[in-house]
Amino acid sequence: MFCVTPPELETKMNITKGGLVLFSANSNSSCMELSKKIAERLGVEMGKVQVYQEPNRETRVQIQESVRGKDVFIIQTVSKDVNTTIMELLIMVYACKTSCAKSIIGVIPYFPYSKQCKMRKRGSIVSKLLASMMCKAGLTHLITMDLHQKEIQGFFNIPVDNLRASPFLLQYIQEEIPDYRNAVIVAKSPASAKRAQSFAERLRLGIAVIHGEAQDAESDLVDGRHSPPMVRSVAAIHPSLEIPMLIPKEKPPITVVGDVGGRIAIIVDDIIDDVDSFLAAAETLKERGAYKIFVMATHGLLSSDAPRRIEESAIDEVVVTNTIPHEVQKLQCPKIKTVDISMILSEAIRRIHNGESMSYLFRNIGLDD
């Protein structure tokens, strides 16, 4: 596992105040690796807690030490059973609240349901609902990483620190990709162009944008709500009304804006889950002359048969952080590499507990990052 260690953070982190308790809210042991790394860096023991499933599938949490008057940090990494993961977190937060904890800080590197942060058809904004549930349960602060949409921070009525994984991914590119100076940063769609531009400017590299790919779930075209109503129902409202309709979108044939011929292509995004768009982008880049293709993302959900499809694809390497456990996927696909981000989470915990400024962790981060 690739790990970045800035010189100023090489020594064990100094917890100057007492009263810190670190819990892992996961009942799944494979999801506790990140918690153990954070505890080791902080030089503290994991708090004593039992999280398990009853035979009737109900979640039960038993806190086995006093948290009265203490700063409680609850680390929750998302497993495949995301709904169980959420219930484990909510029950543990509420248990700490009713046990008179001084503050309850959630450390949730990947915020679940973050893709459902916009209204879809007759659905709902689920990430807003989840934020309200966490606040109601008793969460007083949230530490997360690379939210799918930064606007999700506004769903909370508590402080939210949205950390960035890009410094770790940038250093991986510089240290682990030979001849990265001959690379071009690629956005697989115009929606991810800002992230690609941020990487390109920091690495002093060129940028390419793929446009015209198949319609994705983030676009306006799939929003099935009709307000104003569709043409066939307009006449039923009032015969004298003539409300203009928005012209439907038509995507052009797939196009690569930028030169990738004879270059290393590095596709950057925040999440890699369903790999269809990444595989299509890789095929297009190969056709345009790219001789090596990397994919860099913060959160590696890698659902379903994603590892097998990546292994059989034109992609040479997929680099993700350990915000989400993916050891099984790595066994299925040797192309998947991991960057450890436990250091920045540990430092955030230390600073919040000691009452120090968090600005150090947001150096050189702009509005578009």
Swiss-Prot record:
This is Phosphoribosyl pyrophosphate synthase-associated protein 2. InterPro entries: Pribosyltran_N, PRibTrfase_dom, PRTase-like, Rib-P_diPkinase. NCBIfam families: ribP_PPkin (TIGR01251). The modification Phosphothreonine is found at residue 5. One of its GO terms (biological process) is nucleobase-containing compound metabolic process. It comes from Homo sapiens (Human). Gene3D superfamilies: 3.40.50.2020. The modification Phosphoserine is found at residues 219, 227, 233. The lineage of its organism: Eukaryota, Metazoa, Chordata, Craniata, Vertebrata. The keyword Transcription does not apply. It comes from the Eukaryota. Ubiquitous.
